[in-house]
């Protein structure tokens, strides 16, 4: 469970941020630095969100039941899912580069504990111009590329399915309230409020299309934190059952991070400390 969004301010500043949710105590995360690439990763540096010196930002998101990886290829570069983000950040300057490189890659299976299967992943890519694309491994190890005009992202199902659902939902949603209603906010009646990826995508689409565009870099970061606050998950409200122990496993927002592509600053807050900090 994760939610991501890009905002472009009037002064041209591009900021992109995300929440990260995962089963409690399953994965740990820390600051990542590799040359000119900075971000947040697992201690081994494999599950990475990061930005390079060109302002290219790549986020990895969970893609359960939909990621389809291939067998080793003789004609393409074989790469593991946990290697994709760092490889692209090392090789590409912008979305155009990523699109070209993606055609040369064959994403193959790997063993990566604590996952019992190859980690199912897809990727959100944003560059300094504000262009955004999605990479999804939908068959035979090939990465399918989708343009992402709203710069929003969650998890499964596929990106085209999300966009179709969002398009239909937005036809019936508005920021304008009924003037005769007893409460403000009636224009958004029907906006889904649950934590499923499909519902979160629709909420992101609504925010993307209705928020007041910030004027400055600082305003863009501030606005994006306000939006992502709506996707923050406190421990207890989302849970599953561990089939081996019978105990609840909780999902919570481990961290929220924002990359300011103009200033190259990275700011974040985590579950136990809601104060915004520089990475």
Swiss-Prot record:
Keywords: Hydrolase. InterPro entries: CBAH/NAAA_C (IPR029132), Ntn_hydrolases_N (IPR029055), Peptidase_C59 (IPR052193). It comes from the Viruses. Signal peptide: none annotated. GO terms for molecular function: hydrolase activity. The keyword Cell division does not apply. Belongs to the peptidase C59 family. This is Uncharacterized protein A284L. It comes from Paramecium bursaria Chlorella virus 1.
């Amino acid at each position: 469970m994760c939610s991501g969004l890009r905002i472009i301010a009037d002064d041209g500043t591009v900021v992109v941020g995300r929440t990260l949710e995962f089963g409690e105590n399953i994965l740990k995360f820390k600051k990542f630095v590799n040359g000119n690439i900075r971000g947040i990763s697992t201690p081994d540096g494999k599950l990475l969100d990061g930005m390079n010196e060109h302002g290219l930002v790549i986020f990895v998101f969970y893609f359960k039941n939909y990621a389809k990886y291939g067998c080793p290829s003789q004609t393409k570069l074989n790469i593991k899912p946990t290697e994709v983000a760092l490889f692209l950040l090392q090789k590409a300057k912008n979305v155009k580069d990523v699109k070209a490189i993606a055609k040369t890659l064959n994403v193959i299976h790997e063993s990566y504990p604590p996952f019992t299967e190859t980690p199912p992943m897809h990727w959100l890519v944003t560059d300094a111009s504000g262009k955004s694309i999605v990479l999804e491994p939908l068959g035979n190890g090939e990465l399918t590329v989708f343009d992402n005009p709203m710069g929003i992202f969650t998890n499964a199902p596929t990106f085209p399915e999300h966009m179709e659902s969002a398009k239909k939902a937005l036809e019936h949603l508005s920021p304008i309230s009924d003037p005769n209603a007893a409460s403000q906010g009636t224009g958004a009646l029907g906006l889904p409020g649950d934590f499923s990826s499909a519902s979160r995508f629709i909420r992101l689409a609504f925010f993307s299309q209705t928020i007041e565009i910030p004027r400055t870099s600082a305003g863009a970061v501030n606005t994006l934190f306000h939006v992502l606050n709506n996707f923050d998950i406190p421990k207890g409200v989302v849970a599953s059952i561990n089939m081996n122990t019978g105990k609840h496993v909780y999902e919570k927002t481990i961290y929220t991070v924002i990359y300011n592509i103009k200033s190259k600053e990275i700011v974040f807050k985590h579950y136990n400390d809601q104060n915004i900090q520089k990475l």
